[in-house]
Amino acid sequence: PKIRVGKFEEGRVTLTRDAPFILDARCELGNAQRVGLDYKDLPKDVKPGDVLLLDDGRLKLTVQRVVGHEIHTTVKVGGELSNNKGINRQGGGLTAPALTAKDMDDIRTAALIGVDFVAVSFPKSAADMYMARQLMRAAGCAALLIAKIERTEAVANLDEILDASDGIMVARGDLAVEVGDAAVPALQKKMIRAARDRNKLTITATQMMESMITSPVPTRAEVSDVANAVLDGTDAVMLSAETAAGKYPVEVIESMSRVCEEAEKSAEIGLDRELLNRVFDRIDESIAIAAIWTAYHLKVKAIAALTQTGSTALWMSRPN
């Protein structure tokens, strides 16, 4: 799961550069000097010199020493820190399990309410996804299983995680904190390509139209970001704070929809020319691709996919 700080007496504090700050696994309510942790084993996972990033990297702490259940740090980049914000170690390597007892309860709840997707946060390997799949089956949950790629280890084990999942989420927030902002754009393209090669779905997420939390229109950079995700071949783009806490939830959906529709009109993604040289394992996939190429060259306006299970339509959607 995502590792978080606890709550503060006043709901939030301001950390100043070069000030000492303690992460205390036994602290109940925090203040400007210390705060609790929801992951009690974090002191075992860090050592002096480690860099800890809080609130998606907005604040930065350097570990000075570990004393029992306390992590003594120095604030390197300060700012406001509020309740339940996330913690990452730069470079990854935390031992927190992907699935907790609460996750198992949540999977059972998901089965009862009939959700379409179950996403596993912070998986490290295929083993985490197989465990989630087993729990879903035991609970009678038929949802598609999505791996949120957020850890350095998940990037290294991407192929096996894809094979164990129905799709992946390119979760750029925590991923950027672990691998560095500059590495994320290339990784996004790599992950989408790897998923497409396996006919697995991809969801691209995090700060796609972040400015629309407070602004009625997106920035040009955000428009380009969303469009490029579509051009990369992502199956879905996702909003978070923009709709959960933003002032313009309807407008941001409308804006994102317009950008996606315009990007999908691009001839560059109409057909993937690498498919010409691809060897197909499934007859239905090869027939679907042949139909798409035929339709493209005949300039038809639509394809009617006759299907009983819906799989034909899914196969034919893959070039886009």
Where are these regions (language model features)?
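Non-catalytic helical/linker scaffolds that mediate oligomerization, partner binding
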Residues: P1-N320
